[in-house]
């Protein structure tokens, strides 16, 4: 279609004269327009053929760009560079993220210790070189899947392993720090509270029992902590150093504000050793000159006293108070008994015991003769006056006499004797009918006119 230049009437391309106004169309102009339309149509066909190739080319360019982008962030070398940069820049949060596993969460403070440990025990330059060489060898190897970076002393500090692939093309490298268990062994039941893996943690350790407090990556640690025992609460640190261990555990050194008490007793020579006690803050314990008591918090006063027995009587020292300002890690204190008071009492009791022993010697000499006469004559009356009527021992001896099973005794010796009111306990060594020496414990009752009678007996 074409338009009349004079009136604007539409006409077919092959029409020579306008039907509206009679204008004669130029035939050369129509021919030119036809040629131009054919060229445009030809060019359009060529363009349509080129579009798919252009799209393919564009996609290839995008794929190449994407590949290089992925390689920059996901190749083994790129993964290595991320870890190296984090360590070089002391990026503890990034290192914590890279080293954390499902089973062991690493927090930023632990990562900070780890970074310092690498720089001290390997050296940053050497670590980077070892890491790059290890990754390169693993990446090229078809058999090896893991290797370790070590400190100058030969301890493993980082495990590098192949763990599948990333985006099909790249080996996925895993960086894992080996762990050890720090262990405590307190003298008494202790509760420890500290932060680990980004969370508050509580560990309860029984007395004299090895107890792990968790899993930690290599480093030299000084962890703020609180501990609680029967003696009080303590603020301080749990310290441990991987350099000091060649096993799967590392010993913890406790650094708390605590005082340990060494006690010396004076004036106690007459006291029974097994009866000596020390009371610290109302808690009574057996005394030993070689024992250290504690620990106790250094921020609280301590009260302390001692006690012991002599001849059945308990003697005590004065209670002393150790001010918090005077407490040290090792604190010594001396407690004094009234030695004159103890010696006077012991002397008095020994006189009484000697008098009592003499009575008992006389009593058991007669009792042994009466016992043997009752056995020989099968007559309980010989021995009945020595035993309290109505007691179980009275009935037992009477029955033995009637059955002829009473044991003969001789040579009684008084080993020990104590009197409590009208009751007397005596340890007597004698010879039985088989000629064997035996120790027997007797209980006697002292009646009117100091008359002694047996109540019961037992083998020592």
Swiss-Prot record:
Q: Which cellular compartments is it found in? A: Cell membrane
Q: Predominant location of this chain?
A: membrane
Q: Which organism is it from?
A: Staphylococcus aureus (strain JH9)
Per UniProt, what is one Pfam family of this protein?
TcaA_2nd
For this entry, the protein name equals Membrane-associated protein TcaA
User: What is known about its induction?
Assistant: Induced by cell wall active antibiotics oxacillin, D-cycloserine or bacitracin.
Q: What does this protein do?
A: Plays a major role in decreasing resistance to glycopeptide antibiotics.
Q: Which residues lie on this side of the membrane: Extracellular?
A: 71-460
One GO cellular component term of this record is:
plasma membrane
- Family membership noted in the UniProt record: Belongs to the TcaA family.
Tell me the GO BP annotations in alphabetical order.
response to antibiotic
Q: Which GO terms describe its molecular function?
A: zinc ion binding
* UniProt xrefs under InterPro entries: Mem_prot_TcaA, TcaA_2nd, TcaA_4th
């Amino acid at each position: 279609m074409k338009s009349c230049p004079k009136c604007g009437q539409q006409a077919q391309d092959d029409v020579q004269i306008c039907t509206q106004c009679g204008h004669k169309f130029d035939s050369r102009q129509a021919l030119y327009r036809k040629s131009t339309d054919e060229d445009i149509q030809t060019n359009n066909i060529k363009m349509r053929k080129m579009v798919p190739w252009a799209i393919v080319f564009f996609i290839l360019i995008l794929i190449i760009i994407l590949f290089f982008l992925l390689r920059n962030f996901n190749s083994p070398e790129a993964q290595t560079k991320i870890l190296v940069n984090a360590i070089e820049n002391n990026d503890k949060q990034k290192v914590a993220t890279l080293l954390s596993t499902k089973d062991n969460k690493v927090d930023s403070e632990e990562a900070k210790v780890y970074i310092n440990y690498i720089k001290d025990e390997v050296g940053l330059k050497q670590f980077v070189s070892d890491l790059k060489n290890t990754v390169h060898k693993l990446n090229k190897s078809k058999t090896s899947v893991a290797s370790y970076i070590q400190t100058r002393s030969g301890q493993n500090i980082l495990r590098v392993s192949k763990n599948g692939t990333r985006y099909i093309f790249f080996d996925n490298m895993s960086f894992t720090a080996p762990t050890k268990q720090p262990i405590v062994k307190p003298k008494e039941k202790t509760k420890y509270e500290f932060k680990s893996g980004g969370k508050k943690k509580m560990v309860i350790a029984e007395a004299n029992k090895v107890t792990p407090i968790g899993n930690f990556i290599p480093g030299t640690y000084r962890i703020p902590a609180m501990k609680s025992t029967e003696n009080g609460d303590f603020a301080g640190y749990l310290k441990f150093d991987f350099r000091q261990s060649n096993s799967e555990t590392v010993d913890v050194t406790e650094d708390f504000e605590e005082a340990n008490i060494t006690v010396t007793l004076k004036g106690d020579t007459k006291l029974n050793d097994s009866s000596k006690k020390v009371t610290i803050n109302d808690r009574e314990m057996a005394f030993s000159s070689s024992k250290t008591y504690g620990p106790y918090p250094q921020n609280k006063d301590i009260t302390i006293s001692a006690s012991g027995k002599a001849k059945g009587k308990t003697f005590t020292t004065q209670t002393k108070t150790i001010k918090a300002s005077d407490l040290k890690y090792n604190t010594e204190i001396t407690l004094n008994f009234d030695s004159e008071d103890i010696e006077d009492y012991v002397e008095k009791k020994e006189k009484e015991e000697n008098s009592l022993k003499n009575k008992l010697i006389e009593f058991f000499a007669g009792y042994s003769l009466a016992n043997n006469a009752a056995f020989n004559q099968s007559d309980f009356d010989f021995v009945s006056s020595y035993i309290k009527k109505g007691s179980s021992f009275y009935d037992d001896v009477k029955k033995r006499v009637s059955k002829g099973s009473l044991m003969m005794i001789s040579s009684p010796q008084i080993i020990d004797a104590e009197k409590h009111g009208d009751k007397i306990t005596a340890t007597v060594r004698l010879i039985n009918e088989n000629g064997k020496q035996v120790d027997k414990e007797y209980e006697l009752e002292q009646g009117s006119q100091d008359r002694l009678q047996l109540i019961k007996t037992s083998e020592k």
